[in-house]
Amino acid sequence: MAPQLLLCLILTFLWSLPEAESNVFLKSNVANRFLQRTKRANSIFEEIRPGNIERECVEEKCSKEEAREVFQDNEKTEAFWTVYVDGDQCLSNPCHYRGTCKDGIGSYTCTCLPGYEGKNCEHVVVKSCRLFNGNCWHFCKTVQNDTQCSCAEGYRLGVDGFSCIAEGDFSCGRIIKSRNKREASLPDFHFSDDYDAIDENNLVETVQSQSATLLKKSDNPSPDIRIVSGLDCKLGECPWQAVLIDEHGKAFGGGTILSPYFVLTAAHCLNQTKSIAVVVGQVDISRKETRHLLHVDKAYMHSKYVRATYDHDIAILRLRTPIQFSENVVPACLPTADFADEVLMKQDFGIVSGFGRLHERGSTSDILKVIRVPYVDRYTCMLSSNYRITPSMFCAGYGNQPQDACQGDSGGPHITAYGDTHFITGIISWGEGCGRKGKYGIYTKVSNFIPWIKTIMRRNQPSTESSTGRL
């Protein structure tokens, strides 16, 4: 009896299965009345429907143009797209010290707060003089992760710790507008019988070319070379300009006023005449009746000067009587070596002045000329010359314009302005012709000789120095 009952139960279960399936699963025509989905591809109304980022880019893969149609904004599209393509790189917050992260495709960019740098803003920036000269008006020095400003002689540091305040009426490097147009009559000129080339404990000596090591590539550079196509320098606009006068009363070179007793010039100028006098404060040297000649007491030539190649072409003249400063006579400031190399010589232009030839084969000028000359990078400088450009030299000029220093300008100033202060950066030395295409003027690099200049001036300072001077 039991087997028969079990068989009946099995048959009953099998008979009920189709009915159970029909109760659970609806037929397709019935199901479609409840479940409907609009087809995406090739829909007739697809292009006229308003953009929807979920429909466009979530339900299916979209292009950047489709995303742009949704946002109608390039910036929002870029922000979405960088995350959509490969995820948000900024989710891990990779930027340190509260830096702001911006996602990119396969990368990210951190915008750091002031004082931090690096890909992830991970480096604390030490205050550096290389950044805007530490905001210093003159000289900058890094001290224990901070910057310390200082000023040229004749200036004091302002209370803000950055500015430099002139202490006198004629502090160095200042161009002062003259109110007095009258020039007083000055004594007749008189020449010193001679001047001495002093050996200052091996700091200076007269160098014979035959004993020097020649550094040239071929023949010697043009002697006494070094304004062509310059503008007239008005009275008071080049107040540091000195003119060298020979024993015949003729101008033959230039110099830069450093203090009441000292004038900077080129070493090769010392070989041009038996005696030297200096004139300052003039822009027209044809007016000999207004000249006041300052007699050279001693001349200090750099001990490493090479006459054949103009290497170390620098000298200092000490005057018997001091220069009287005025609106038209002001010394140039002497920079520190670091300030000259890292700040001044990275400016676009320097200023060159002189009474030299107006063109290569022309006559010298009675009127002081001035030009702006751009600094030339060292590689271009070396390629342009047939002669070796030593570390004590630099190039300035246009290369493709006839504006240059020329014969008779030798020893004159190359000045660079920083703010309202003018610093001596070079000495007109030599060149291959004047204003030739592809050629530049060669200048003695003053920053290489700052310790030498200061030593000469300190050791040979007259005890009767005028109080108007600035060393």
Curated annotation (Swiss-Prot):
<dbReference type="GO" id="GO:0007596">
    <property type="term" value="P:blood coagulation"/>
</dbReference>
<keyword id="KW-1204">Blood coagulation cascade activating toxin</keyword>
<dbReference type="GO" id="GO:0005576">
    <property type="term" value="C:extracellular region"/>
</dbReference>
<feature type="modified residue" description="4-carboxyglutamate">
    <location>
        <position position="56"/>
    </location>
</feature>
<keyword id="KW-0720">Serine protease</keyword>
<feature type="modified residue" description="4-carboxyglutamate">
    <location>
        <position position="75"/>
    </location>
</feature>
<dbReference type="InterPro" id="IPR001881">
    <property type="entry name" value="EGF-like_Ca-bd_dom"/>
</dbReference>
<dbReference type="GO" id="GO:0004252">
    <property type="term" value="F:serine-type endopeptidase activity"/>
</dbReference>
<keyword id="KW-0325">Glycoprotein</keyword>
<keyword id="KW-0677">Repeat</keyword>
<dbReference type="InterPro" id="IPR000152">
    <property type="entry name" value="EGF-type_Asp/Asn_hydroxyl_site"/>
</dbReference>
<feature type="disulfide bond" description="Interchain (between light and heavy chains)">
    <location>
        <begin position="172"/>
        <end position="333"/>
    </location>
</feature>
<dbReference type="InterPro" id="IPR035972">
    <property type="entry name" value="GLA-like_dom_SF"/>
</dbReference>
<dbReference type="InterPro" id="IPR001314">
    <property type="entry name" value="Peptidase_S1A"/>
</dbReference>
<dbReference type="GO" id="GO:0006508">
    <property type="term" value="P:proteolysis"/>
</dbReference>
<feature type="domain" description="Gla">
    <location>
        <begin position="41"/>
        <end position="86"/>
    </location>
</feature>
<dbReference type="GO" id="GO:0035807">
    <property type="term" value="P:induction of blood coagulation in another organism"/>
</dbReference>
<comment type="similarity">
    <text>Belongs to the peptidase S1 family. Snake venom subfamily.</text>
</comment>
<feature type="disulfide bond">
    <location>
        <begin position="136"/>
        <end position="149"/>
    </location>
</feature>
<dbReference type="InterPro" id="IPR001254">
    <property type="entry name" value="Trypsin_dom"/>
</dbReference>
<dbReference type="InterPro" id="IPR033116">
    <property type="entry name" value="TRYPSIN_SER"/>
</dbReference>
<dbReference type="Pfam" id="PF14670">
    <property type="entry name" value="FXa_inhibition"/>
</dbReference>
<feature type="disulfide bond">
    <location>
        <begin position="233"/>
        <end position="238"/>
    </location>
</feature>
<dbReference type="InterPro" id="IPR018114">
    <property type="entry name" value="TRYPSIN_HIS"/>
</dbReference>
<dbReference type="InterPro" id="IPR018097">
    <property type="entry name" value="EGF_Ca-bd_CS"/>
</dbReference>
<feature type="modified residue" description="4-carboxyglutamate">
    <location>
        <position position="69"/>
    </location>
</feature>
<feature type="modified residue" description="4-carboxyglutamate">
    <location>
        <position position="66"/>
    </location>
</feature>
<dbReference type="InterPro" id="IPR012224">
    <property type="entry name" value="Pept_S1A_FX"/>
</dbReference>
<dbReference type="InterPro" id="IPR050442">
    <property type="entry name" value="Peptidase_S1_coag_factors"/>
</dbReference>
<feature type="modified residue" description="4-carboxyglutamate">
    <location>
        <position position="59"/>
    </location>
</feature>
<dbReference type="InterPro" id="IPR000742">
    <property type="entry name" value="EGF-like_dom"/>
</dbReference>
<dbReference type="GO" id="GO:0090729">
    <property type="term" value="F:toxin activity"/>
</dbReference>
<dbReference type="GO" id="GO:0016504">
    <property type="term" value="F:peptidase activator activity"/>
</dbReference>
<dbReference type="InterPro" id="IPR000294">
    <property type="entry name" value="GLA_domain"/>
</dbReference>
<keyword id="KW-0800">Toxin</keyword>
<feature type="domain" description="EGF-like 1; calcium-binding">
    <location>
        <begin position="86"/>
        <end position="122"/>
    </location>
</feature>
<feature type="propeptide">
    <location>
        <begin position="21"/>
        <end position="40"/>
    </location>
</feature>
<feature type="domain" description="Peptidase S1">
    <location>
        <begin position="227"/>
        <end position="458"/>
    </location>
</feature>
<dbReference type="GO" id="GO:0044469">
    <property type="term" value="P:venom-mediated blood coagulation"/>
</dbReference>
<keyword id="KW-0301">Gamma-carboxyglutamic acid</keyword>
<feature type="modified residue" description="4-carboxyglutamate">
    <location>
        <position position="60"/>
    </location>
</feature>
<feature type="modified residue" description="4-carboxyglutamate">
    <location>
        <position position="47"/>
    </location>
</feature>
